[in-house]
Swiss-Prot record:
Coiled-coil ranges per UniProt: none
Subunit structure, as described in the record: Homodimer.
Subcellular location, record wording: Cytoplasm, Cytosol
Classification via Gene3D superfamilies: 3.30.300.10, 3.40.50.880, HUPs
The organism's taxonomic lineage, starting at the top: Eukaryota, Fungi, Dikarya, Ascomycota, Pezizomycotina
Catalysed conversion reaction: XMP + L-glutamine + ATP + H2O = GMP + L-glutamate + AMP + diphosphate + 2 H(+)
Gene field: gua1
Pathways per UniProt: Purine metabolism; GMP biosynthesis; GMP from XMP (L-Gln route): step 1/1
E.C. number: 6.3.5.2
One GO molecular-function entry: GMP synthase (glutamine-hydrolyzing) activity
PANTHER family: GMP SYNTHASE [GLUTAMINE-HYDROLYZING], GMP SYNTHASE-RELATED
Residues of the active site: 91 (nucleophile), 183, 185
Protein name per the record: GMP synthase [glutamine-hydrolyzing]
Organism, scientific name: Aspergillus oryzae (strain ATCC 42149 / RIB 40) (Yellow koji mold)
Positions contributing to ATP binding: 238-244
């Protein structure tokens, strides 16, 4: 994407850079800022300023699970403090600001402070008060820390206190450097969004112009410049909202020079191929090619149970198929008006995919290789062969849905649940066989159909049925059986970074379970996954 950096979001919009020290809340900082129509990006705390390709309007140092004084604790590049832009430290970030001035400034608290606390703001005068402009003098905030400031850093004022934190808020006397022990990004903090707005808009001077209407124009211009007047793009589509929106955006940018490819891996949902054809080709006017590679994928995954090995194989084989299709398209169009080399490969990668795949030393190590990020072969990520183009890479899921509406995609399509590129293959825990694929496919169809019939589909962020690797004893037809277990998963979420299990009524789950056991051969037991994210991920592999 570096070919046209001047059109990337952080160069087209005022940007707040959030440096992540491993807090479970860090992504919420970016979310809250974007809800304020201020563009924000999150990078690991190891990001060196010299390697940053843009100048942010402000920098936020996130919370984290470390103690700043421990050996091996992460520390920010000191060069950020010489950048000349406002800085806000949150929790660990506050302690990092204080620690770099004097290592004795941060101490272990005599009592930990988790949950709600009453914060009292202190007026000092001048720019120091800007963080709390327009807010009440006292309000409840969310705390999550064991360490605290033992003394006020030299050159700083105290701007807020709580019963357990004498220095719950600090501000530099002359520089726009602020620190908060509380978490303004968490919804439990009253005025949290206002605090972030005061920092981003009033202190950093960011314009509140980050909208999908603006993004569409910027991204179409970027795509056109990147691809050029004759270049062609091949795109992976799966039937999910991400790939559909990405495909429509590419169609708007370069017209018939975009070719969508649906790889039938044999792991699609019931009737998925026909539905994708109808959506993309008939409703959205997109060139669609269906490549049947089901036998190749099934044979290649035989005997593989490890989820990372599955993802790596699927990622590599996907690109093999796409490169074959690219050659066919180029040959067919060699002497036509659309002649041109296919040099790019479109993916519907989202920002949560990127965040989950970022690794740095510490607790925010890679959760899993994402099939849209780490599952690709090196020849793709290192610029060999087809080059990656990911227009949704900086967006959260709700922003993608908004973008889809901006592009004129119908409500039903925009609200479709995500469907991973590897399909049912990563919803079958353990080894994949044709029989197990069919079980998972039928169970999923029953589950989703009943969710739709109950009028719950749009209330749920994502839902699916998966197959457990173990089996269980049951009694069917007066006989003992030892058969498979289906796992049902449905979550409520807005950004797919955090999620909670959807609270179905007991009667509904009973009816779903009864249908699956009666209608799906080889299944004798059904379980519902109540795990939230974190600690779980939404997909099981």
């Amino acid at each position: 994407m570096a070919e046209t950096p001047e059109l990337e979001p952080h160069n087209a919009f005022d940007t707040i850079l959030t440096l992540d020290f491993g807090s479970q809340y860090t992504h919420l900082i970016t979310r809250r800022l974007r809800e304020l129509n201020v563009y924000s990006e999150m990078l690991p705390c190891t990001q060196k300023l010299a390697d940053l390709k843009f100048k942010p309007a402000g920098v936020i140092l996130s919370g984290g699970p470390y103690s700043v004084y421990e050996e091996g604790a992460p520390h920010v590049d000191p060069a950020y403090f010489d950048l000349g832009v406002p800085i806000l430290g949150i929790c660990y970030g506050l302690q990092e600001i204080a620690y770099r001035l004097d290592s004795t400034n941060v101490i272990a608290g005599t009592s930990r402070e988790y949950g709600l606390a009453q914060l009292k703001a202190k007026k000092v005068g001048g720019h120091v008060d800007h963080l709390f402009d327009g807010l009440e003098d006292e309000f409840n905030v969310w705390m999550s820390h064991g360490d605290k400031l033992g003394k006020l850093p030299e050159g700083f004022h105290t701007i807020a206190t709580t019963p357990n934190s004498e220095y719950a808020g600090i501000a530099h006397e002359t520089k726009p450097i602020y620190g908060l022990q509380l978490h303004p990004e968490v919804t439990h903090t009253q005025n949290g969004t206002k605090l972030l707005k005061n920092f981003a808009v009033n202190i950093c001077g960011c314009k509140q112009n980050w909208t999908m209407a603006r993004f569409v124009d910027q991204e179409i211009a970027r795509i056109r410049k990147l691809v050029g007047p004759t270049g062609q793009v091949l795109g992976a589509v799966s039937g999910g909202v991400d790939s559909t929106v990405a495909a429509k955006l590419m169609k708007e940018a370069i017209g018939d020079r975009f070719h969508a490819v649906l790889v039938d891996t044999g792991f699609m949902r019931l009737n998925e191929c026909e539905q994708v054809k109808q959506t993309l080709a008939e409703h959205l006017g997109i060139n669609l090619i269906v490549a049947d590679a089901s036998q190749v994928f099934m044979e290649g995954l035989k005997g593989i149970s490890d989820p990372e090995q599955k993802r790596k194989f699927i990622g590599n084989k996907f690109i093999d198929v796409f490169e074959e299709e690219a050659k066919k398209i180029e040959d067919a169009a060699a002497h036509s008006e659309t002649a041109g080399k296919i040099g790019f490969f479109l993916q519907g990668t989202l920002y949560p995919d990127v965040i989950e795949s970022i690794s740095f030393k510490g607790p925010s190590a890679t959760i899993k290789t994402h099939h849209n990020v780490g599952g690709l072969p090196k020849r793709m990520t290192e610029g060999q062969g087809l080059k990656l183009i990911e227009p949704l890479r900086e967006l959260f899921k709700d922003e993608v849905r908004d973008l889809g509406r901006q592009l004129g995609i119908a409500h039903e399509m925009v609200m479709r649940h995500p469907f991973p590129g590897p399909g049912i293959a990563i919803r079958i825990l353990g080894e994949i066989t044709p029989e197990r694929v069919e079980m998972a496919r039928k169970a999923d169809h029953i589950f989703i159909s009943m969710i739709r019939e109950a009028g719950l589909y749009d209330k749920i962020g994502q839902a699916f049925a998966a197959l457990d690797p173990s089996r269980a004893v049951g009694v069917m037809g007066d006989k003992r059986v030892y058969e498979n277990i289906v796992l049902l998963r449905a979550v409520e979420t807005t950004d797919f970074m955090t999620a909670i299990a959807y609270p179905f009524e007991h009667e509904f789950l009973t009816r779903v379970s009864t249908r699956i056991v009666n209608e799906v051969s080889g299944v004798c037991r059904v379980a519902y996954d109540y795990t939230s994210k974190p600690p779980g991920t939404i997909e099981l592999e």
